[in-house]
Amino acid sequence: DHVAGRKYGLECYSPVEDNGVFSDDVQFFGGEFIFKANATINEKLKALNLLLKNENLAHSYPHCWRCKKPVIYRATPQWFISMDKMGLREKSLEQINTVQWIPSWGRERIYSMIENRPDWCLSRQRSWGVPIPVFHCTKCSEIYVTRESVDKIHQLFTKHSSDIWFEKDARFLMPEGAQCSGCGSTEFKKDHNILDIWFDSGISHAAVLEERGNLSRPADMYLEGSDQHRGWFHSSLLTAVGRTGNAPYKAVLTHGFVVDENGRKMSKSVGNVVAPDSIIKQYGADVLRLWAASADYKAGISISDNIIRQLSDAYRRIRNTCRFMLGNFDDFNVMTDMRQINQMSELDRFILHRLHRVVGICLSAYEKYEFHTIYHALHNFCVVDLSSFYLDIIKDRLYTSPAGAPGRRDAQTVMFII
């Protein structure tokens, strides 16, 4: 109704007071609670012979998430950040293309959100939060906010915290000699709205990157769950572009959320929750770390006892491979016993070639934040190339050759390089 009214230039009509009753200018029903008035309105329409039909329909209706009571939407004065008057939308869309989005579909997601979003409603009606530092003339309702008034609030907040806004009246909070530009009055009242919490988090780049000497703008990366394209990534982009003209980050990485082995959300009522403490107690912290590193975080990340058991076996194979190599260095002096690669056998040079390939895969994966690729490359190298092939072949050299034999030193050098 509101959108249709705006389209045809109709006045924004909001006849409901803050306490949920019709305002006095509503004929017949002024002062009556809106939901109790439904029956009265039906009776009045019937009495005026204007009620064509009355029936119940099952439909979706907004309810309070906390108390489950029905709610209504009211048109009330709010503070907004315009997306178009100063070109914020266009500039933000341009800056999106300067950022590395990981995974790449994140770019399309946030681009579509910024492209189609309405103006940002900045104000909230809550009991406590970060106040909007604005004053209103009590005589003509003119808004009062100046550089001097903002500086005064900044000084008070620095000394007393934002609680001072709620504890003191407007006279204490305003600079001396403040006058209304509309009527010249010196009587003001505070604005009672607080800032949207997404504005609070959205300016963290200014609070952190500009206040800490060892940091600089923009941040190398913002990392959060995929829901933050609508949240932190979104608000940070708008506040940074609005203030500096540039995105606050070089890259944005988003991850999915932990689900069970069937892809279902973790829930105590379903009984599919896997607690980290129980994994650490049974398998050790390294297995939990390996699970995190092995998962492709771009989508939902599955976890279950069966998955952890498989990762535990993989961890044991990697660890045992390393233990075998470390166990053969007792008589090996790096300073005196290292061998030249060009003096080694084809087998030794081959495994070093395989190592070089694996290192290349891992370095490339690190650059792309594809940690699961690193796990798979490392696991395959340990199990296939080393344990089942190279280490199995060189056991004779290690166990039967004299301590200083060239072949034995070649094998030790290769293992040391690995």
Regions found by a protein language model. Give the residues of each.
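Short, contiguous acidic/charged loop-to-helix segments that flank catalytic cores in large enzymes
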Residues: 210-213, 221-228, 309, 403-414
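Short, amphipathic alpha-helical segments that act as regulatory/interfacial helices
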Residues: 237, 315, 319-326
